[in-house]
Amino acid sequence: MIVYSGLKSDFLTAVEQDSIATEIEETIYKKMHRRTAQNEFCSWENSLEYMYKVLNDKAIPSDSGVAIEYNIPQTSKRVDFIISGYGEKQNPNVVIIELKQWDKVEAVDGQDALVGTYTGGAVRKVVHPSYQAWSYAAMIYDYNQNMQMGNIILHPCAYLHNYRKSNPEKLEQKQYKEYVKDAPVFARGEALKLREFIKKSVKVGDNKQLLYDIDRGKIKPSKSLQNAIKSMIEGNQEFIMLDEQKVVYEEILKTALLCMNDQKKRTIIVKGGPGTGKTVVAINLLAKLTNEGLFA
């Protein structure tokens, strides 16, 4: 479900009139009967001002589609910002942008795709923003039949508009290269670079047609658990882990390696309600530990 959708021209006007955050808030209440927290409202006002700067270019068609807060089906996750249109050869393109208000980030060694940053009142391990954008795009593509039938190409990226890159840049260290290649990271002072990234894919407006295709796409049936586990043990990727799932997975892997090294037993209890992805974490761990010879 898309919370807010409009043309690029609609979005620019709403930001100019200081109404965009209110429009999103009202739509969320209308569609989901949920009140918006003040910090979330402020984050929209802040981040969307930066997206205004990025999109305020005549080379990006005024009738391109803009979506804000797209709820990924079968998950509780939301894509922050989407812009849609056609490329030079009329190929359908959708740019997915993960917006972050972080101003400091630390690399996390020894755990795939994790970084440390201040969030939720403390410094925590979270997924790298490039991994987050890439995994959201992969999830949408895997489960939305319109994406595959319409040959819609997804272009994920992350925009950390409060964060200034350093030299060497922590978010672009060797351990993150694979994810940054698939989903580039743009930081404070790089609005023009993000604009160029969008302009490469969106040259002709789609009048929101691609947003409609995404929002109305038929959801593919869930994969067979038995077949998926067999495929994963053979080295194939079947279930993509999102956000906290990836963090928990990496923490358990770290603990498993510690147990192998010091020969001590440890128990990890993963709590979560229905649909939070405990099974996804478990089968990814089963496949990984089996392939690494760590599963007894």
Please place each PLM-identified region on the residue numbering.
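Conserved lysine of the Walker
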Residues: 278
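N-terminal pre-P-loop "Q-motif" helix
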Residues: 237-266
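The conserved Walker
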Residues: 274
